[in-house]
Amino acid sequence: MTNKDNPKFHTISTEYIDYLREADSKVPFNKDEQHSRPYVGVLEKINGHDYFVPLTSRNDKNFNSQVSVKLFDNDEKRIGVLLVNNMIPVPEKECKEIDIAEKTAADPQYGNLMLKQYLFLKENMDRVTNKVEKVYKDVTVQGKPSHKQKFLKGVCCDFPKLEEKCQEYKERDQAKERDKARRIAYMRQMGRER
């Protein structure tokens, strides 16, 4: 998980992304395998879940500042956008940390972009965390929502629904692990009886 002094990039398994997309079409697709969409881990659990915020390098689109954090290099050139509205809860087993040095060795241009994004995030994680917490709170508010909250609910993933799906996925995965352990134990038992 990320800490304030060391933000980390992760990839999320396509299988898990596709699973969430069945429940909420606002969950962004993963990209190709060469440059799978990077996510930034949020500093602390939200409602008991580890949330990850997708990062895009697209600069040809205007992003609403209420639900995104724009990243800039030292020359004030936009180098990416965190899409807070599309953040998702992810089980630990479904995310993998990205090694920026490996990315740089494989694709220097992409690796250097990620390094610039990392440096920006390192200086601005408090701002990112505050935005994430505010958006989450506004989207999950109970009672009659304000105009802003209605807007946010319309452009953000359905966080409560995704949390349910995340929990179901974890439970399904645990059941698979138990079944696998039972099969292995059974096979060992059968081997001893021969």
Swiss-Prot record:
Record Pfam families: ToxN_toxin
Summary of subunit composition and partner proteins: One ToxN monomer binds to a 34-nt-long single repeat of the ToxI RNA; this complex forms a triangular heterohexameric complex with ToxN connected by the ToxI RNA to another toxin molecule. The ToxI repeats are cleavage products of their precursor. The ToxI repeat forms a pseudoknot which occludes the toxin active site.
UniProt feature, compositional bias: Basic and acidic residues: 171-182
Coiled coil: 114-182
UniProt-reported outcome of changing Y110A: Overexpression no longer inhibits growth in E.coli
Keyword entries, A-Z: Coiled coil, Endonuclease, Hydrolase, Nuclease, Plasmid, RNA-binding, Toxin-antitoxin system
Organism: Bacillus thuringiensis subsp. kurstaki
Ranges where the record places region Disordered: 171-194
More about this protein: Encoded on a conjugative plasmid that includes genes for a type IV secretion system.
The protein's Enzyme Commission number: 3.1.-.-
Protein name as catalogued: Endoribonuclease ToxN
UniProt family annotation: Belongs to the ToxN/AbiQ toxin family.
Gene this protein is translated from: toxN
GO molecular function: RNA binding; RNA endonuclease activity
Stated role: Toxic component of a type III toxin-antitoxin (TA) system. An endoribonuclease which cleaves between the first and second A of AAAAA sequences; it tolerates other nucleotides in positions +2 and +4 of the consensus. Digests cognate antitoxin RNA ToxI as shown by the 2'-3'-cyclic phosphate at the 3' end of the 34-nt repeats and probably other RNAs. Inhibits growth when expressed in E.coli without causing cell lysis; this bacteriostatic effect is neutralized by cognate RNA antitoxin ToxI, which has 2.9 nearly identical 34 nucleotide-long repeats.
Example GO biological process: plasmid maintenance
Statement: the UniProt record of this protein carries the keyword Hydrolase: yes
Keyword hit for DNA damage: no
Superkingdom of this protein's organism: Bacteria
